[in-house]
A protein has these predicted regions:
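Hydrophobic/aromatic beta-strand positions that recur at structurally equivalent sites within the blades
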Residues: 1-4, 29, 39, 48-51, ...
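Beta-strand-rich domains and repeat architectures in extracellular enzymes and scaffolds
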Residues: 1, 14-33
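Beta-propeller fold detector
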Residues: 5, 10-15, 50, 57-63, ...
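Beta-propeller and closely related beta-sheet repeat lectin domains
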Residues: 23-27, 69-74, 118-124, 174
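Short coil/turn linkers that define WD40 beta-propeller blade boundaries
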Residues: 6-7, 44, 54, 80, ...
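Entry beta-strands of beta-propeller and related beta-repeat scaffolds
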Residues: 33-37, 79-84, 129-134
Length: 174
């Protein structure tokens, strides 16, 4: 923990609960809720860290290997959902858009964005109901052994209609 006013760092000893992320890149701070949220997209598990009790509120441990290494994920404050795109797992890149609802009992939505090649290590930002996705590494087939490449392109995805638009693309080696 970084204390900005004192310019010092501190550690919090976790006393209990389940951290549901099975790998370190499945954690997000949600400023609108002042919460640290651990997530597991394969199993649709979530756990909130309570800094006062120093415990994770999750009770179920993850058991599956996941398919979303180095995905991009944003919090959507309009409906309290998590919006994820892409990732890597089991020797495949993916182009799945996942919309998850950690604060309510709503099924996770899986949408294949076939207009975008499968990839991981993308960047994204949410502006109103539009998700912008930039770059990444992957390949058209999604199979890691078939000539992966870096992407330098920008897409917009309307979260209501799932309409995908390619806004621009730079050369492969800018």
């Amino acid at each position: 923990v970084f204390h900005a006013t004192e310019q010092v760092t501190d550690s919090i000893q976790v006393k209990g609960g389940e951290f549901v992320a099975n790998y370190p890149n499945q954690l997000i701070y949600i400023p609108q809720r002042h919460q640290l949220l651990s997530y597991n997209l394969n199993e649709n598990l979530y756990s909130i860290f309570d800094p006062y009790t120093q415990c994770w509120k999750g009770t179920q441990a993850p058991v599956k290997e996941h398919d979303y290494w180095n995905n991009t994920l944003v919090y959507n404050p309009s409906n309290s959902s998590l919006v994820s795109f892409g990732g890597y797992g089991h020797y495949h890149y993916n182009n799945k858009l996942l919309i998850s609802y950690p604060y309510e009992n709503t099924p996770q939505r899986h949408i294949n964005l076939t207009n975008i090649h499968p990839r991981y290590s993308t960047s994204s930002v949410l502006v109103d109901s539009t998700l912008y996705i930039f770059g990444g590494r992957g390949c058209p087939s999604g199979r890691q052994e078939l000539s992966p490449r870096n992407y330098y392109d920008l897409y917009s995805v309307n979260l209501f209609t799932q309409q995908v638009n390619k806004l621009w693309e730079a050369p492969q080696n800018p």
